[in-house]
């Protein structure tokens, strides 16, 4: 009986039905199928598809779906989350921090070019998108860190994931590129 109640209670989108309030200094425009959000840190645009209706009523943005089809339910929550991320991005910005754990692992940047020494025979050089600001932190006695900041949450996440993919943390010693605060699943080595 309990399972039936829980199953029937999922008819409404938990994320999509929550309205998004615009903070002071952020403007929101809807034209055709494109929404544009402008703030003190920059401007972001997103194309809206599949008949999802977006309304801006006195600084409160609501997202509505035309039907209860599976696709419309999925897009309902998606577009609400994207709009919320855009508003936070142009107002406060998004950041990710990576930590390089390993002997001889180093990171340096010159503008948008990131140079990584991750224990390979050659350094890895990455040309990062101009929308992402890179900061490398190297303190004596501590692991080097890379801080990425941008107004676009998706872009920051994609760049951070690409950097991490060059040397993912291994489970035995924990060496590699990891997110700051990431908890790694560790394994015990061979017992003699």
Regions found by a protein language model. Give the residues of each.
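N-terminal intrinsically disordered, cationic/polar leader segments
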Residues: 11-88, 92-161, 165-192
């Amino acid at each position: 009986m309990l399972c039936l109640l829980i199953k029937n209670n999922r008819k409404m989108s938990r994320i999509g039905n929550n309205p998004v309030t615009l903070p002071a200094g952020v403007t929101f425009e809807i034209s055709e199928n494109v929404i544009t959000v402008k703030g003190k840190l920059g401007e972001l645009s997103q194309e809206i598809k599949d008949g999802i209706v977006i309304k801006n009523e006195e600084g409160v943005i609501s997202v509505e779906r035309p039907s209860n089809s599976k696709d419309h339910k999925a897009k309902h929550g998606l577009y609400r989350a994207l709009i919320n991320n855009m508003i936070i991005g142009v107002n406060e910005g998004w950041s990710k921090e990576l930590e390089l754990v390993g002997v001889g692992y180093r990171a340096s940047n010159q503008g948008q070019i990131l140079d990584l020494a991750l224990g390979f025979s050659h350094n890895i050089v990455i040309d990062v998108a101009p929308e992402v600001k890179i900061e490398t932190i190297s303190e004596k006695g501590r692991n080097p860190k890379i801080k990425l900041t941008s107004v676009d949450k998706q872009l920051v996440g994609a760049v951070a994931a690409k950097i991490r993919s060059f040397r993912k943390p291994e489970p035995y010693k924990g060496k590699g590129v990891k997110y700051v605060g990431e908890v790694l699943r560790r394994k015990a080595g061979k017992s003699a």
